[in-house]
Amino acid sequence: GKVVSERNAAALSLAAAQGNVIAPATGRALRAIPEQVMAFPFVHYAITINGAKVSDTRTGQALLRAEIALDTCLRLLDFVGRYDAMYDCYWNDTGWVDRSFLERVRYYNSDEEVVTLLRTTRAPVDDLKAFLREKGQPVQKVQLCFRDMAERETARAEIAAAFPEILVTSSFRNNLELNAADADKGRALLA
């Protein structure tokens, strides 16, 4: 797991004492931020899901949202169906995935840590697109996991070209993360 060393914690405390705003910025949802980080007395805000949401850590209230419109998300999911990749998406601070993908999570991910992460943080549904249509709301992030790294690079370029309103990033070896172009940890800091 990710741990903040005593030295770094001391540096953060000092920076906070000097009047700087210290906000964890992560691809995770608020509840997945390590307790150690949330326990720092100077952490008042958190930038989560790659900047899709900025929250007040005391109240949990959302201060800023940058989400993918539902129709864009559904077009994206249709588009990425051409790749040999599993996909999931964050809606309402939870990662949702087709049950069939979760059952084959090892086919797409050779890294045991990633397999465990996906199994513990994704909620399975029978049909993700139908689930999202039924909810009728924008989504926070779409994630893809690829078996083949060359295909991942092709997909990165093709998605960026076909969806200018989407920001394509990645956080581990075989994934791509798709956020609204205005969801960006840097922009979120300006809020």
Task: Go through each PLM region and give its residues.
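Active-site phosphate-binding/coordination module
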Residues: 8-112
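Conserved acidic, metal-coordinating active-site core of Asp-based
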Residues: 79, 83-86, 90-191
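Conserved SAM-binding loop
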Residues: 4, 22, 46, 144, ...
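Short, acidic loop-to-helix structural element flanking the phosphoryl-transfer center
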Residues: 2-20, 65-72, 124-129, 151, ...
